[in-house]
Amino acid sequence: MSDNSQNLLYDKFELPKSVKMMTVEGSGGSIDKHARFVAEPLERGMGHTLGNALRRALLIGLEAPAIISFSMTGVLHEYMAIEGIIEDVTNIVLNLKGALLKKYPFQDSEDGRRPQLLKSMISIDASDLAACGGQRAVTLADLLQEGGFEAVNPEHVIFTVTQPMQVEVALRVAFGRGYSTSERIILEDKGVNEIVLDAAFSPVVLVNYFVEDTRVGQDTDFDRLILYVETDGRVSPKEALAFSTQILTKHFSIFEKMDEKKIVFEEAISIEKENKDDILHKLVLGINEIELSVRSTNCLSNANIETIGELVIMPEPRLLQFRNFGKKSLCEIKNKLKEMKLELGMDLSQFGVGLDNVKEKMKWYAEKIRSKNVKG
C-alpha cells in the first residue's frame, strides 16, 4: 500500500510571470471587443494543451443575458403585420435576436440569475414623427426603461413607426450559455400572446490560438501561446479569459481530489533586484574556484568554459554535446550549482549577457567588481 502522506518532488515547470494583453490591429486600439493575449514561456507541448482547453471553455462556457421572449400590444402571433409599423412581427423577432444586453448577475443581487420581465411603454405622437421625417425608429435603448440592463448596441433598431401610436412592449431576459432554440426554452408563466425566441447567450464571437517557439536563456525548446479573443461586447476579452480560466479550474478540481500523493515543484531561479549583485559575484567566479572533481573541471576546460557565467548560460543538452561530458559530470555540476542557488540554462539577458558575448561580459563584470572593491 502506497504512502500518501509525503509529497512528491517534481522538477520545476517554466511558467509565464504574467499574461500580456495587446490590442489587435484594425480594432482602433479598443480592447472592449478584440484583444490578443501572450503567455510565455511554457514547457514544450503546454501551449497547445492550454490553448485548446481555453478555446473550448471560452466558446461553450461563458454566460450572458439574452432576450428569450417578447410580447407587444396587438401582436397575436409571429406571422402577422402591424398597422403603422414597417416591419412585420417576423422581422421584429429577428431584430430582437440582434439585441445585446449587458448585466452581471452578482451573487448578492436581489434578482440573481432569475429571468426578468422588462416592460416599456412606447408613445409616439405626430410631433415625434414630424421631427423624424415621418418615420420614428424604436431602438433597443427605448425598450430598456427598467431592469438595470445596459444596451451594448443601444442604437440597434427594433421596429419603425409610421403613425402615432402607444404600445407596450415586454421583453423577458434570462441568463444562459451557448445557444438555445425556442423549443428548448420553457416558460412557467408564459403569457397567451408571448412569443418565445431563439437565444444566443454566448458573448464570445471568435477564439483562435497559435503556438510559437520561444527561449529561456539559450534554450529555445519552449512554447509561446498567443490567444486571440473577440467578443460581442457583453463581456470584454479580458473578462472572458478570466471567467473561462475559473471554469476550467472548477472542473480540474474534481480530479485533484483523488486520494493520491501530492506533487510539489522545485522553484525556478529568480534573479531579483536585491540579489542581483550577489549573483554577479558568483557568475564571474572561475570554474577552478568551485569544488568540482578533476574530471568535471577538465571537461569544462576542454569546452573552453572558464567562468560560472559561461556555464550557467548553457542549456543542459548543449553541455552533453561536449566531448567526454557524461551524465555523471552533469549530475555533479547541477548539484554544485544548486548549492550556489544557480542552475543551467539561466536567462542572463538582464545583465546584457548572451551566448555570443558571455566570455567578454564575464571579464568586464569581473574587472568592474575588482575596481569597486579597490575603491571600497
UniProtKB/Swiss-Prot annotation:
Known EC number: 2.7.7.6
InterPro entries in alphabetical order: DNA-dir_RNA_pol_insert (IPR011262), DNA-dir_RNA_pol_RpoA/D/Rpb3 (IPR011263), DNA-dir_RpoA (IPR011773), RBP11-like (IPR036603), RNAP_asu_C (IPR011260), RNApol_insert_sf (IPR036643)
Keyword Nucleotidyltransferase: yes
A Pfam family matched in the record: RNA_pol_A_CTD
Molecular function, one GO term: DNA-directed RNA polymerase activity
Ranges for region Alpha C-terminal domain (alpha-CTD): 276-376
Highest taxon listed in the record's lineage: Bacteria
A cellular component annotation (GO) from this entry: DNA-directed RNA polymerase complex
GO biological process: DNA-templated transcription
Keywords: DNA-directed RNA polymerase, Nucleotidyltransferase, Transcription, Transferase
Positions of the UniProt region annotated as Alpha N-terminal domain (alpha-NTD): 1-259
Reaction(s) catalysed by this chain's protein: RNA(n) + a ribonucleoside 5'-triphosphate = RNA(n+1) + diphosphate
Similarity field: Belongs to the RNA polymerase alpha chain family.
Known partners and oligomeric status: Homodimer. The RNAP catalytic core consists of 2 alpha, 1 beta, 1 beta' and 1 omega subunit. When a sigma factor is associated with the core the holoenzyme is formed, which can initiate transcription.
Function statement: DNA-dependent RNA polymerase catalyzes the transcription of DNA into RNA using the four ribonucleoside triphosphates as substrates.
Domain notes: The N-terminal domain is essential for RNAP assembly and basal transcription, whereas the C-terminal domain is involved in interaction with transcriptional regulators and with upstream promoter elements.
Protein name: DNA-directed RNA polymerase subunit alpha
Organism field: Chlamydia felis (strain Fe/C-56) (Chlamydophila felis)
Gene it is expressed from: rpoA
